[in-house]
């Protein structure tokens, strides 16, 4: 069956960025964004997605325009693309909807300097978020982003004392025995042990064009021992020790070949309540997997097409 090319790379149906922003109007409205834009001969404003400074101002502007969030990023840190992060949040909304929860508590594993997932979850949905981060500079920026948006009542940024642990450090020190409804994670994609960690290709160039965006982020944010597969395997292992603390465990994956490896790892551990999805935004595709140790089947959510 041939898929409709028009919809092949479409975003989640509720993603506000399915309708492309009018960069010309936004450049008039936001001075800092205007200063990094390019003016075409037609008078239209264009955005150079391969320029890191431009991407930073674009992300900051879109967060302000669509969610009234005032966000800054640590120098050299990962610049989050809003469309992708929204796709992830919307997928979580879909899975949580059947539960009819009055209060939602989530964990953001590795929130980075932007703390974008926690900010979006809190601002958009009123979720209570625990943001875990191990890098000191990122922790400082994340806490400042929470403070400047007056979301301290909904978001706690927790400094991970040991980055080799996922939930362990927090759960061992947290006395209230809080239960969480989900965790999310954007793991380091690349294997730090590889001789060329950034040389891998996450796409099939014969079937899909290259992503437009320049790669951003520090080595610590982009690489870890064993890459994303090993990182998510650690989440799976810790999830088995915390079956009652988190209802739905999820993680994004940047490489399609990682998906069957994670599914096999879950199967080996007899975890069968599993669902997957794809996030499409422009020429970039990401994958995600969710699993639960509870008997209620996971909702697959709305697919991005």
From Swiss-Prot:
EC annotation from Swiss-Prot or TrEMBL: 2.1.1.346
InterPro entries: DNA_methylase_N6_adenine_CS, METTL16/PsiM, METTL16/RlmF, SAM-dependent_MTases_sf
Region (Disordered): 194-217
Keyword Transferase belongs to the record: yes
Keywords of the record: Methyltransferase, S-adenosyl-L-methionine, Transferase
Enzyme class: transferase
One family name in Pfam for this protein: Methyltransf_10
Residues at which S-adenosyl-L-methionine binds: 85, 110, 133, 164, 186
CC terms in the record's Gene Ontology section: nucleus
Gene3D superfamilies in alphabetical order: Vaccinia Virus protein VP39
Family: Belongs to the methyltransferase superfamily. METTL16/RlmF family.
Function: RNA N6-methyltransferase that mediates N6-methylation of adenine of U6 small nuclear RNA (U6 snRNA).
Protein name: U6 small nuclear RNA (adenine-(43)-N(6))-methyltransferase
Organism annotation: Drosophila pseudoobscura pseudoobscura
């Amino acid at each position: 069956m041939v898929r409709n090319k028009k919809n092949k790379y479409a975003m989640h149906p509720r993603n506000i960025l399915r309708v492309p922003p009018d960069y010309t109007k936004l450049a008039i409205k936001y001075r800092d964004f205007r200063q990094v834009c390019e003016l075409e001969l037609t008078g239209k404003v264009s955005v150079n997605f391969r320029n890191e400074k431009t991407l930073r101002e674009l992300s900051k502007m879109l967060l302000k325009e669509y969610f009234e969030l005032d966000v800054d990023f640590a120098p050299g840190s990962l610049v989050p693309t809003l469309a992708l992060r929204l796709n992830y949040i919307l997928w979580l909304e879909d899975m949580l909807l059947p539960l009819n929860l009055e209060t939602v508590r989530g964990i953001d594993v590795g929130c980075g300097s932007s703390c974008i997932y926690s900010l979006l979850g809190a601002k958009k949905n009123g979720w209570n978020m625990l943001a875990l981060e191990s890098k000191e500079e990122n922790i400082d920026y994340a806490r400042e982003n929470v403070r400047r948006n007056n979301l301290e009542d909904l978001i706690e940024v927790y400094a991970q004392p040991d980055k080799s642990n996922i939930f362990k450090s927090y759960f061992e020190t947290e006395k209230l025995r809080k239960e969480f409804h989900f965790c999310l994670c954007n793991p380091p994609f690349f294997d730090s042990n590889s001789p060329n960690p950034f040389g891998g290709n996450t796409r099939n160039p014969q079937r899909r064009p290259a992503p437009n965006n320049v790669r951003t982020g520090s080595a610590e944010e982009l690489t870890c021992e064993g890459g994303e597969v090993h990182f998510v395997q650690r989440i799976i292992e810790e999830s088995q020790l915390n079956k009652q603390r988190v209802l739905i465990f999820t993680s994004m994956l940047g490489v399609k070949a990682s998906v069957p490896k994670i599914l096999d790892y879950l199967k080996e551990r007899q975890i069968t309540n599993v669902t997957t999805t794809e996030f499409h935004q422009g020429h970039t595709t990401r994958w995600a997997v969710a699993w639960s140790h509870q008997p209620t089947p996971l909702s697959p959510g709305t697919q991005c097409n």
